[in-house]
């Protein structure tokens, strides 16, 4: 079985499957799943000595505005191995722009059946202010030393908007 066969979720948009590409707090290496092969490749080494504050991955069978699957940051008590699939619930979205255009980062936590620790978190407003600041700081600066790459942070949006973005990305994929 390859990652290409993974569904978008159990009950879209409230219950999603996220394919993890980069573990939280890991070395500054950008991994991406090759969409044709369904295998994890090293995309590039990030020249800024920073680590992802959360696990980073995507929802399969979605298409965002840049043509790639929809990006997701998953806050967990422990880092998740790249290539793993985790059942999640979205709680919000970080809206930003980069050199490719509008770029959404869905923020999710493990589904309560996977981890009870975050069961009281139902929206981005329930997430720790420190973690939200770390996420913004990371995305503001992780491309700083790369030529012709930039990021502009727009701000946070709630769970309802995250779910709309997920539904839209699923529809774009199936067109």
From Swiss-Prot:
Which region is the signal sequence?
none
A biological process from GO? phosphate-containing compound metabolic process
What name has this protein been given in UniProt? Inorganic pyrophosphatase
Pfam families cross-referenced by the UniProt entry: Pyrophosphatase (PF00719)
Instruction: Look up the EC number in the record and give it.
Output: 3.6.1.1
InterPro entries recorded = Pyrophosphatase, Pyrophosphatase_sf
Q: Which domain of life is it from?
A: Bacteria
Query: Can you tell me which family this protein belongs to?
Result: Belongs to the PPase family.
Q: Give Gene Ontology CC terms.
A: cytoplasm
What are the disulfide bonds?
A: none
Relate the protein's function as given in its record: Catalyzes the hydrolysis of inorganic pyrophosphate (PPi) forming two phosphate ions.
Return the Gene3D superfamilies for the record.
Answer: Inorganic pyrophosphatase
Q: What are the binding positions for Mg(2+) 1 in this chain?
A: 66, 71, 103
Q: Where in the cell is it found?
A: Cytoplasm
Quaternary structure, from the entry: Homohexamer.
Question: Coiled-coil regions in this chain?
Answer: none
**List of residues binding Mg(2+) 2:** 71
Listed binding positions for substrate are 30, 44, 56, 142
> Which controlled-vocabulary keywords does the entry list?
Cytoplasm, Hydrolase, Magnesium, Metal-binding
User: According to its UniProt record, where is this protein mainly located?
Assistant: cytoplasm
The coenzyme or cofactor needed here is: Mg(2+)
* Reactions accelerated catalytically: diphosphate + H2O = 2 phosphate + H(+)
Q: Is Phosphoprotein a UniProt keyword of this protein?
A: no
Can you provide one Gene Ontology molecular function annotated for this UniProt record? magnesium ion binding
């Amino acid at each position: 079985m390859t990652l290409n066969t993974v569904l978008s979720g159990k009950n879209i948009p409230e219950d999603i499957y996220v394919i993890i590409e980069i573990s939280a707090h890991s070395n500054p290496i950008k991994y991406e799943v090759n969409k044709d092969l369904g295998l994890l490749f090293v995309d590039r080494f990030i020249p800024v000595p920073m680590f992802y504050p959360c696990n980073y991955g995507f929802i399969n069978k979605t298409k965002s505005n840049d043509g790639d699957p929809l990006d997701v940051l998953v806050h967990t008590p422990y880092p998740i191995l790249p290539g793993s699939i985790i059942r999640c619930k979205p709680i919000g979205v970080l809206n930003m722009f980069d050199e490719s255009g509008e770029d959404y980062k869905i923020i999710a936590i493990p589904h309560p059946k996977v981890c009870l620790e975050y069961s009281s978190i139902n929206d981005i407003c329930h997430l720790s202010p420190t973690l939200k600041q770390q996420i913004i700081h990371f995305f503001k600066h992780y491309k700083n030393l790369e030529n012709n790459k930039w990021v502009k942070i727009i701000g946070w949006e709630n769970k309802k908007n995250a779910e709309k973005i997920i539904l839209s990305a699923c529809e774009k994929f199936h067109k």
